[in-house]
Each structure stands twice: as structure tokens, then as C-alpha cells.
């Protein structure tokens, strides 16, 4: 078992500290049978979705303004 621990932590020695922290949290949740795992990887996705949605809304508004001005003038 000591060799297993040494191998697991040896992998994370050259890695970022966040990776080790996430790994420890996952191991804790598995050992304690918790259903919630704190993960910071998915929080950035919602920002991209909102950015894409806002981009398309602005694009549609610009198209509608262009068509309106084309008809009025």
C-alpha cells in the first residue's frame, strides 16, 4: 500500500497544486461515500455559453436594425 501512495503522489509532484487538491477531494468523497464533489473545471463553461448567446443576440439585433434602416431610408 505504501508503494501505491508513493506512486500516486509522485505523479502529482510535478503537477499543479490544484490537481493534487482536486484529487484529494475526489478520494475523500469516494472514501466517505459523499455524492457531491467540488470541481472547478466546469465553472468556466457557463461563461462561454453566455458569451455565445449574447454574441448571437447582438448579431440578430444588428441585422434587424440594418433591415429597419434599409426600409425607412
Swiss-Prot record:
InterPro entries to which the protein is assigned, alphabetical: Poxvirus_I2
GO biological process, one term: symbiont entry into host cell
GO cellular component, one term: membrane
Membrane topology label: Single-pass membrane protein
Keyword vocabulary terms for this entry: Late protein, Membrane, Transmembrane, Transmembrane helix, Viral penetration into host cytoplasm, Virion, Virus entry into host cell
Domain of life: Viruses
Any Pfam family matching the protein: Pox_EPC_I2-L1
Subcellular location: Virion membrane
Transmembrane stretches, start-end: 49-69
Described function: Late protein which probably plays a role in virus entry into the host cell.
Family statement drawn from the similarity comment of this UniProt entry: Belongs to the orthopoxvirus OPG078 family.
Protein name per UniProt: Protein OPG078
Species assigned in the record: Monkeypox virus
Lineage, top ranks: Viruses, Varidnaviria, Bamfordvirae, Nucleocytoviricota, Pokkesviricetes
Gene responsible for this protein: OPG078
Amino acid at each position: 500500500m505504501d508503494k501505491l501512495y508513493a506512486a500516486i503522489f509522485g505523479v502529482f509532484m510535478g503537477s499543479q497544486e490544484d490537481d493534487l487538491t482536486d484529487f484529494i477531494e475526489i478520494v475523500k468523497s469516494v472514501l466517505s461515500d459523499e455524492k457531491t464533489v467540488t470541481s472547478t473545471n466546469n465553472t468556466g463553461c457557463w461563461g462561454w455559453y453566455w458569451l455565445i448567446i449574447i454574441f448571437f443576440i447582438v448579431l440578430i439585433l444588428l441585422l434587424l436594425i440594418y433591415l429597419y434602416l434599409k426600409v425607412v431610408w
